[in-house]
Amino acid sequence: MATPSAAFEALMNGVTSWDVPEDAVPCELLLIGEASFPVMVNDMGQVLIAASSYGRGRLVVVSHEDYLVEAQLTPFLLNAVGWLCSSPGAPIGVHPSLAPLAKILEGSGVDAKVEPEVKDSLGVYCIDAYNETMTEKLVKFMKCGGGLLIGGQAWDWANQGEDERVLFTFPGNLVTSVAGIYFTDNKGDTSFFKVSKKMPKIPVLVSCEDDLSDDREELLHGISELDISNSDCFPSQLLVHGALAFPLGLDSYHGCVIAAARYGRGRVVVTGHKVLFTVGKLGPFLLNAVRWLDGGRRGKVVVQTELRTLSGLLAVGGIDTSIEPNLTSDASVYCFEPVSEVGVKELQEFVAEGGGLFVGAQAWWWAFKNPGVSPLARFPGNLLLNPFGISITSQSLNPGPFRTPKAGIRTYHFRSTLAEFQVIMGRKRGNVEKGWLAKLGPDGAAFLQIPAEEIPAYMSVHRLLRKLLSRYRLPVATRENPVINDCCRGAMLSLATGLAHSGSDLSLLVPEIEDMYSSPYLRPSESPITVEVNCTNPGTRYCWMSTGLYIPGRQIIEVSLPEAAASADLKIQIGCHTDDLTRASKLFRGPLVINRCCLDKPTKSITCLWGGLLYIIVPQNSKLGSVPVTVKGAVHAPYYKLGETTLEEWKRRIQENPGPWGELATDNIILTVPTANLRTLENPEPLLRLWDEVMQAVARLGAEPFPLRLPQRIVADVQISVGWMHAGYPIMCHLESVQELINEKLIRTKGLWGPVHELGRNQQRQEWEFPPHTTEATCNLWCVYVHETVLGIPRSRANIALWPPVREKRVRIYLSKGPNVKNWNAWTALETYLQLQEAFGWEPFIRLFTEYRNQTNLPTENVDKMNLWVKMFSHQVQKNLAPFFEAWAWPIQKEVATSLAYLPEWKENIMKLYLLTQMPH
């Protein structure tokens, strides 16, 4: 099938003017999906002629039937039937309602005849948009390779009828909508037409809210909220971007968990996780959804085999289902989870021709397993759903009640908010609902990840954003001059990042001021730089490999590597500041400042608006060894590796390497801090040897092999997403913590509580964690262990919270209220473990963590996990610890207590003393 660009050129070849009949008032056309494109657009941005494809056939739609019998438009009409006819020489059929068109075509040497019915032998069929008897025949004709030229307007038809839902009842729409083109009841302006040399843009917004309000009401009938609080799942956030798509459940940040859409003659409902098909509280909504998807046909409802629980929920509401592995030819509604690319086209045609699709899927796990690959572009569910105007993102939502849109109250939608943003940017005034611009930025950045090449519906948004952002200088967010997120400047930061990552010309994105990270201040080397990168990864997850290179902001770089490495699933990443700040109220930097992409070609170009250190992401179990990586457009950054970098090399790098961020590395820990801080470090070796001792202790307590298979990373940033520091890969901290990381004297005297707390968080395992009680507790075991065994700082001095009088008071307060595991959290929970450690030492913990690593099929519920811990620790120390844990109000099961009764009593149990001396409550 020809590309839309080539098709547009063919349709416009030789057309120099639009001499349309003055008395023919057209209607505006609405374009959705990935195949439709505009041909004629007036100066108001309204599409009046459009084209598309469906199946093996093609479609041209004009917004008034009189245009098809206007001799002045002969050049265009000839182009249209020529492009529509896939079989050269095949006759053109013209419906009697357009008889003058046959004469126009015949007068130009085209074999055209008046035909009351469409026939398979025809190459093209021309008809007005009011015929109600040939709908199925026309769709089949087009699907099988025929060309359809259709014209009409719906505003007058709407004025004469009782049904106001023109998009779904106008006869022409029952045909053209399968290819993504709708006649609307909006009158088209005819005061000025321009013959476009290149394909015009599709407008961001065509008003059709009235056509969708009944759908929303039917789906949410009797439902005030969508409560998934007890679903035990984190659904993906949905991006609702289609003109006929609408949200049904929103959180306080306008994050969408369930959405619906019209597409062609069919309907779609999407949930952000398949588990939502099993949530009992959603039962009324699930019933509403299936009935709406069925559209009153009372047809067959097919449920994918893996989702059989949904079948039971629907049966309670009186809906019979058929459990099948795949879609069946007689289905009216199909409920399933998309897990592969197989059958995408068939499913899209199923919907376009009237079917109902109920989809449940999340993309965050797929995104985790495929770093550097956008789920908007490659996740199987989105290959199916993107044309419907709903996409599943990698952002997760917290389970909880989601509000539903209320009639008469405006609800956030990407397209309507983008249209308002466009108005404000043009007029420099206007208001948008609270929180909408903060949501527009990340939504726009996500939308820009959808592959847009030769897809006019997406490219039009790209073009609009390029135009808007090129008019104004890009805000520069700093701590001294933060940018408010929920405003146009905040939205610009996210949208500009998305544009840059989509490959747009970065020269259009000029900052308000040049900062030290921008290319004018960091001149990249004119010659390519080649570095050897260790691409062996024995770990169980991907890892970042440092290159010692920095990419200036707004720089396009070219990365080259050997052919063999280009097929090894390597990725490239610019930047290490991975925190997503899209929900921050104020921004001290861009909300998303890294860029990742696959190194799937020997030579690859990549851009990053903000710049950053350059990394190669190596997949787990990679055995590539050393790989030469050549980069054009980079500068050197300070980098020190313990055992490899000499002191002379370090001093030279600090003086000569201009990168504003640098790294200190061992085989077990990598610290990323500003170069300005590194310049105060004359010799990193003593510091890093101390850090290696710390990491060895961390590994020893956690029963991990040392050296670590995957070095931990700590990255300093001007702003992070949560807390003073937070765990993860990498661990993130504020710039104020840099001295705590790189000042050896300070570490030895004051300690390392914050960083080791996060290293401890990374050591926690769900098998022996009891969230939320121990989330901020057990990680501090590593703090105590490191401070006492490596730094020689006793626990009472390492943290004021562990001063003995404070500890005793905490326990007594816990007991005085009546011991209850609901109140057993954080420091109180840590006390339980410290009492055990002070009695039995560290070795039982180390042996226990080793035992946990070697076991499989461990329980997942807190009560069962806590009882297993009691049993295993009791066996480690050969004491019956059930009474000790009962004193702490752990839910000890009777059979566990009985099974431990044979062990000796723990006579030194300190909780006995507390209980004996506790005042009655």
Curated annotation (Swiss-Prot):
GO molecular function, one term: transmembrane transporter binding
Principal location: membrane
Tissues expressing this chain: Isoform 2 is expressed in the prostate and strongly expressed in cancerous prostate samples.
GO cellular component terms given for this protein: plasma membrane
Top-level taxon of the source organism: Eukaryota
Keyword Membrane on entry: yes
Family matches, as InterPro entries: Class_I_gatase-like, M60-like_N, Pep_M60_3, Peptidase_M60_dom, TCAF
Keywords: Cell membrane, Membrane, Transport
Residue ranges constituting the Peptidase M60 domain according to the UniProt record: 542-841
Gene3D superfamilies: Peptidase M60, enhancin-like domain 2, Peptidase M60, enhancin-like domain 3
Keyword Transport (UniProt): yes
Gene Ontology biological process: negative regulation of cell migration; positive regulation of anion channel activity; positive regulation of protein targeting to membrane
Location relative to the cell: Cell membrane
Domain notes: The C-terminal region is necessary for the channel activity stimulation.
Subunit structure: Interacts with TRPM8 (via N-terminus and C-terminus domains); the interaction inhibits TRPM8 channel activity. Interacts with TRPV6.
Role summary: Positively regulates the plasma membrane cation channel TRPM8 activity. Involved in the recruitment of TRPM8 to the cell surface. Promotes prostate cancer cell migration inhibition in a TRPM8-dependent manner.
Family (UniProt): Belongs to the TCAF family.
Protein name: TRPM8 channel-associated factor 1
Source organism: Homo sapiens (Human)
